[in-house]
C-alpha cells in the first residue's frame, strides 16, 4: 500500500540504505530520538483488499479510544506499546480516495490542543513543504471534519493523550493534482520518496 511504501522510504533513509548511506540528517536524528515504526497497521486489510477494516470488521482508525483485544488486536498492541514508552511525535500514514493531494490533518479541533502543538505542527508543515514538492497545505480536511469521534482516531487520540505533534498524513490514490505525472500518476516510488523526505 502507499503507506507501506512511504514507510519503506522512511526506513531506508533512517537506516542509511542505498542512496542514503551515511545520511547526515538520519545520523543527527539518531542522536536525539528513538524511532518506533509500525510498517503495516492493517495486514488483514492489505491481504484482503480492505482499505480500513481488519478480518474482524473493525475500522482500525476508529478503535483508538477503547481498543478491544479481540476485535482490534492491532490497535490494542500498538496503543499499549505507546503508553509503555511514551510519545513525542506521531504520524499516521494514509491514502485518501477523494482528495488528489498530499496533506496532513492535525488535532487542532480538540479542546486540549495547545499553542505548543500548534507551533510544532506549523513548523513541520513548513519544513515538509521545503523537503518535498509533493506536499502542500492548501488542500486537505476541514479542522471540523472530526469532532464527535475525534479521539477514536489514532492521531487525535495520541495528540490528546501525550500533548505531542500528532498528524495524519494523506496521500492520493491516483495522482497528486499539484504535481501530476501523466505517465505513472501516484505510485510506490513517489510514496517512498515522500517517506524519505
Predicted regions and their residues:
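His/Asp/Glu-rich mid-to-C-terminal helical/loop segments that flank catalytic regions of hydrolases
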Residues: 178-197
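Active-site/substrate-binding loop(s) of hydrolase catalytic cores
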Residues: 1-151, 156-184
Amino acid at each position: 500500500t502507499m503507506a507501506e511504501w512511504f514507510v519503506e522510504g522512511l526506513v531506508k533513509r533512517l537506516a542509511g540504505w542505498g542512496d542514503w548511506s551515511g545520511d547526515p540528517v538520519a545520523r543527527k536524528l539518531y542522536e536525539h530520538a528513538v524511532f518506533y515504526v509500525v510498517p503495516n497497521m492493517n495486514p488483514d486489510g492489505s491481504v484482503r483488499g480492505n482499505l480500513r477494516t481488519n478480518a474482524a470488521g473493525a475500522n482500525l482508525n476508529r478503535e483508538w479510544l477503547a481498543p478491544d483485544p479481540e476485535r482490534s488486536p492491532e490497535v490494542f498492541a500498538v496503543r499499549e506499546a505507546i503508553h509503555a514508552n511514551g510519545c513525542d511525535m506521531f504520524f499516521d500514514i494514509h491514502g485518501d480516495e477523494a482528495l488528489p493531494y498530499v496533506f496532513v490533518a492535525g488535532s487542532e479541533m480538540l479542546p486540549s490542543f495547545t499553542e505548543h502543538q500548534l507551533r510544532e505542527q506549523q513548523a513541520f508543515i513548513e519544513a515538509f513543504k521545503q523537503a518535498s514538492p509533493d506536499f502542500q497545505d492548501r488542500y486537505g480536511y476541514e479542522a471540523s471534519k472530526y469532532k464527535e469521534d475525534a479521539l477514536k482516531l489514532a492521531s487525535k487520540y495520541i495528540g490528546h493523550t501525550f500533548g505531542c505533534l500528532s498528524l495524519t498524513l494523506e496521500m492520493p490514490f491516483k495522482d497528486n493534482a499539484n504535481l501530476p505525472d501523466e505517465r505513472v500518476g501516484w505510485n510506490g516510488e513517489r510514496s517512498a520518496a515522500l517517506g524519505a523526505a
